[in-house]
């Protein structure tokens, strides 16, 4: 969605200094801002101004933020107006209550002047921030041949306007994610960590994710069990004293675990679908559905060529249906077709099969992901060119991206 650089914003806050700071930050970001410190007259002023967005303090005399939000949501003439609550109340109950009354966002005080305008913009645009923290497969690859795309293994994040925070996989990229969150001085982080499967390149950096050790944070780790081994046991096993000196008991944050099957569920108000994938062991792909947009995270996954004795058309049809019409398909593209000839049965796909899946499923944009550790930046550039050529030969409408470590996309 297009960013609203010139949105008309009305601030209601009985703290004149706070209102002044917010006005300055948003004006510098290109918005047109008005404000009032008089909560009692705010509704009438909003009716006259008809702004695109209201930013309102929750606790004010005479008329509090919840009541003002309720009045606005009950007025059909103000339909479509964004409402962002700001408050020093750090309680989860109050944030939930604000959303129940119709708020589109909840920003805690004291305001972070470095991130405030970006948070408001995300809510205005209603976009999802999708960021890649690691795009490699198998094991990290440092060195001068991996500077462009990065050498870290699988980790992708989705951040939503209402602060829902989804993390996909705990490869070495999650270490950089944790460092970034700590540098931003984020507090009371609530996030879901979705694990595709427990192979090393998808879980082995979880013990190095610093926010797990910070009291006040809360994480749920979700993924498929492996027979009689639960997700909790899978994560704790690699932190056993034999392999690693720190155990789960050292986590300072609240950490929960949930075993998933192939199913559909709702998490934090967002639709989540899971799909069992073609890979050794129990491996899940994820489809995230949010306000008319869908993001599919499909790694690791092997689609056999039609000439293979292992070719399974029923599986590929079900996978295409799972990804159908999605805005984003992030998927295992480990090998070129030539490389794949000697890697059949290793659990990963080649370019032609990935392109075929994206085209048949009519996805909007294909993201090449999970690159082989032996591939240099130049090799990945070549994979991108090969995929682009194949899409062109199919006369496909699918767009192509080969994300680099640190790339941010707004969906």
Identify the function of each model-found stretch.
Residues 19, 61, 79, 91, ...:
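The feature encodes the CheY-like receiver
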Residues 20-28:
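Charged docking surfaces used in two-component/phosphorelay signaling
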Residues 49-55:
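Active-site beta3 strand of CheY-like receiver
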Residues 111-120:
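C-terminal output helix
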Residues 125-299, 304-309, 317-320, 378-411:
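Binuclear metal-dependent hydrolase catalytic cores
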Residues 304-399:
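Cap/insert and terminal regions of metallo-dependent hydrolase folds
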């Amino acid at each position: 969605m297009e960013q609203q650089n010139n949105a008309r914003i009305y601030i209601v806050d009985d703290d004149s200094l706070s209102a002044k700071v917010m006005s300055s930050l948003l004006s510098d970001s290109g918005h047109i801002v008005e404000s009032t410190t008089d909560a009692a007259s705010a509704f009438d002023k909003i009716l006259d101004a008809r702004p695109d967005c209201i930013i309102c303090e929750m606790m004010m005399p005479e008329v509090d933020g919840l009541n003002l939000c309720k009045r606005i949501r009950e007025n059909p003439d103000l339909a479509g107006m964004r409402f962002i609550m700001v408050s020093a109340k750090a309680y989860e109950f109050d944030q939930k209550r604000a959303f129940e009354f119709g708020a589109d966002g909840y920003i805690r005080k004291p305001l972070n002047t470095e991130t405030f305008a970006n948070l408001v913009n995300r809510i205005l645009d209603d976009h999802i921030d999708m960021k890649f923290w690691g795009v490699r497969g198998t094991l990290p690859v440092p060195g001068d041949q991996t500077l462009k795309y990065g050498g870290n293994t699988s980790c992708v994040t989705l951040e939503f306007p209402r602060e829902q925070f989804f993390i996909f996989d705990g490869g070495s990229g999650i270490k950089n994610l944790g460092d970034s969150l700590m540098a931003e001085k984020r507090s009371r982080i609530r996030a879901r960590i979705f694990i595709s499967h427990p192979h090393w390149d998808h879980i082995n950096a979880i013990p190095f994710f610093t926010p797990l050790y910070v009291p006040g944070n809360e994480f749920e780790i979700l993924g498929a069990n492996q027979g009689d081994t639960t997700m909790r046991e899978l994560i704790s096993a690699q932190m056993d004293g034999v392999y690693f000196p720190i155990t789960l008991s050292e986590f300072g944050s609240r950490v929960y675990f949930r075993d998933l099957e192939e199913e559909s569920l709702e998490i934090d108000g967002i639709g989540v679908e899971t799909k069992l994938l073609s890979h050794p062991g129990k491996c899940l792909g994820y489809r995230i559905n949010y306000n008319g947009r869908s993001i599919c995270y499909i790694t690791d996954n092997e689609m056999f060529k039609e000439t293979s004795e292992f070719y399974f058309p029923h599986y590929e049809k079900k996978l295409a249906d799972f990804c159908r019409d999605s805005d984003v398909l992030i998927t295992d593209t480990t090998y070129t077709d030539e490389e794949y000839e000697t890697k059949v049965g290793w659990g990963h796909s080649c370019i032609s099969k990935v392109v075929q899946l994206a085209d048949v499923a009519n996805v909007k944009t294909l993201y090449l992901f999970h690159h082989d550790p032996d591939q240099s930046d130049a090799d990945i550039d070549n994979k991108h060119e090969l995929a682009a050529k194949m899409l062109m030969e199919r006369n496909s409408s699918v767009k192509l991206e080969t994300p680099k470590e640190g790339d941010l996309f707004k969906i």
